Amino acid sequence: MDTLDELLPREKMLRSGIASLSDVELLALFLRTGTPGKDVMTLAKEILQHFGSLYGLLSADFAQFRGVNGIGLAKFAQLKGIAELARRYYSVRMNEESALLSPEMTREFLQSQLTGEEREIFLVIFLDAQHRVLQHSRLFSGTLNHVEVHPREIVREAIKLNASAVILAHNHPSGCAEPSKADKLITERVIKCCQFMDIRVLDHLIIGRGEYVSFAERGWI
């Protein structure tokens, strides 16, 4: 009888479940085929070594993929499709469950929405008094290193939805999640603007490449 380590990813998944697969095996399952002279497991291993992790792989752009032997446009499209499926899954899950059950769930959702974006995107999650999700919206879009945020528009949308609280989030395409002075200032402005309408700002999360910063966790909110 074959041991689990000797099984191909598909057979291993069918026998022991998807969670039994390593990152290399899971990637090989999606890639399906290798390249001339290189089987799919070897290709998957080399790709992960190049990008460091699944996170680094799925947030990479095509220019970064071009430096990897065996990755053409077709396989790049496959991998970006996987990332988009994950993003849509979290979006649907958020809408259907209508609840942020933990800080981890909030972070995972925001990472799924903002990772890999080439411009700064400012997203707001609107919550009711029980912290159930009413809506999440990409309210502002900017450049590579700046996004202009208008606090009054956030408040206007919150009032329209009858929201009692909001969670702010934006990405840093550079990869470093550390907040800038401008990030801190705009957070203060949004908080002050929301306070006039008795709307709480629960957190502001900055999403980088494989890292994040939570203003609430740092005691800034």
UniProtKB/Swiss-Prot annotation:
GO BP terms in the entry: proteolysis
Residue numbers covered by motif JAMM motif: 170-183
UniProt cross-references to InterPro entries, sorted A to Z: MPN, RadC_JAB, RuvA_2-like, UPF0758, UPF0758_CS, UPF0758_N, UPF0758_YicR
Annotated ranges, domain MPN: 99-221
Keyword set includes Hydrolase: yes
Keywords: Hydrolase, Metal-binding, Metalloprotease, Protease, Zinc
Pfam families, sorted: RadC, UPF0758_N
Domain of life: Bacteria
GO MF annotation list: metal ion binding; metallopeptidase activity
Binding sites annotated in the UniProt record for Zn(2+): H170, H172, D183
Database matches in PANTHER family: DNA REPAIR PROTEIN RADC, UPF0758 PROTEIN YEES-RELATED
Family according to the record: Belongs to the UPF0758 family. YicR subfamily.
The name this protein goes by in its record: UPF0758 protein YicR
Organism: Salmonella typhimurium (strain LT2 / SGSC1412 / ATCC 700720)
Lineage: Bacteria, Pseudomonadati, Pseudomonadota, Gammaproteobacteria, Enterobacterales
